[in-house]
Amino acid sequence: MGFGDITNVTTGEARLSYVHLFKPYAHQPGAEEKFSCTILVPKSDTATKARIDAAIEAAKQKGISGKWNGVCPPIVPTPVHDGDGVRPSDGMPFGPECKGHWVFTANTSVDYPPEVVDQNGNPMINQSEMYSGVYALVNVEFFPYMFGGKKGIGCSLGPVKKVRDGEALGGSAPTAAQAFGVPQPAQQPAQGATPWGPGQPAVNPITGLPM
């Protein structure tokens, strides 16, 4: 398996959520930490969806001839879900950002950190440039698995290329400018103003009220 294989897909422009590209993350306590991100592919991008469908079918055939010992399950769990439907984990609707998208999560082990590049293809230096809500191209690999007697198709995370910024999704830490506004130039105290002293009440810098 690898680049050039039909199971390997590079998406069109997609939105990223739950971005953990530089530091591995465990979604549940005690679980294995992995690099990962959730990928939102617009349903209007039928070309990417067709490549994904073909990759999943090819991965099923690899499973039949390999790990699945010649038998394909009647229903094969796949990682791609309808963002207009409900989450398979809890039956609740996907978030509003998923509407009109195909949704899937790709991950890779701590031994294989994904290569992350900027719009020019250069290694991403500023890690804050990749956040939940950014738009990117993502290379993924679909593969068959058999774990604990369960068979299915998984999705491995490969290189990621930022395309453009987008509105940060919930769960992303706001910047200082977003939280407090653009900083204003420091103003000098008026001529003759009484300097701060221990006898004066402290003022809350956010509300302007005495503390």
Located regions from the model:
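Acidic, gly/ser/pro-rich intrinsically disordered tails
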Residues: 1-5, 167-211
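OB-fold ssDNA-binding interfaces and closely related basic DNA-contact patches used
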Residues: 1-105
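Beta-strand elements of well-folded, non-transmembrane domains
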Residues: 41-43, 142-144, 164
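Acidic surface patches and DE-rich sequence motifs
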Residues: 87-88, 118, 126, 204
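Short, basic/aromatic beta-hairpin or loop at an interaction surface
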Residues: 105-119
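Exposed beta-sheet edge/beta-hairpin loop segments within beta-rich domains
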Residues: 115-136, 143-153
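OB-fold/S1-family single-stranded nucleic acid-binding modules
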Residues: 147-167
